């Protein structure tokens, strides 16, 4: 919708999983000024999408997801759960995270990735570019193939 582009100067509805209503709800919660946060890590922590890691003496004591609710974080989690069935690179990322972290962890990890994308788009006033994410996914796939080929060679040698 044209009013969304005027409001945010970038079209957030081009991100997979985001519709006009989702973008309006999100913008009403976070606004368009990203200078409130130092970087995307602070933004993700404010959304309760970053782990609450307790460290003492350089040793990690615990790392849990925050229990507090944040409306904007909930919106991003809802968008992340709709991405689960998509055939694009964000859907691939969700499925990769689901195999590692389980369902809830995958939703949180994908929502965290969406938060980084939104933060960067609003801060730099750039449009969504799926080619960057697809390039990262392609590199991950190539690296995985190389690792598997090395394992096959190692097993053949043994």
Language-model-detected regions and their locations in the chain:
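A detector of single, family-specific signature residues
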Residues: 1-158
């Amino acid at each position: 919708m044209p009013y969304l582009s005027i409001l945010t100067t970038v079209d957030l509805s081009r991100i997979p999983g985001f519709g006009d209503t989702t973008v309006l709800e999100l913008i009403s919660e976070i606004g368009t000024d990203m200078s409130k946060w130092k970087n995307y890590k602070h933004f993700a922590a404010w959304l309760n999408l970053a782990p609450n890691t307790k460290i003492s003496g350089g040793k990690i004591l615990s790392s849990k997801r925050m229990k507090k609710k944040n409306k904007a974080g909930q919106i991003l989690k809802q968008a992340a759960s709709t991405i689960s069935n998509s055939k694009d690179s964000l859907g691939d990322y969700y499925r990769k995270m689901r195999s590692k972290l389980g369902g809830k962890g995958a939703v949180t990890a994908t929502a965290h990735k969406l938060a980084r994308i939104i933060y960067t788009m609003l801060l730099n006033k750039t449009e969504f570019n799926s080619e960057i994410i697809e390039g990262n996914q392609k590199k991950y796939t190539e690296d995985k193939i190389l690792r598997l080929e090395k394992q096959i060679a190692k097993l053949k040698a043994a």
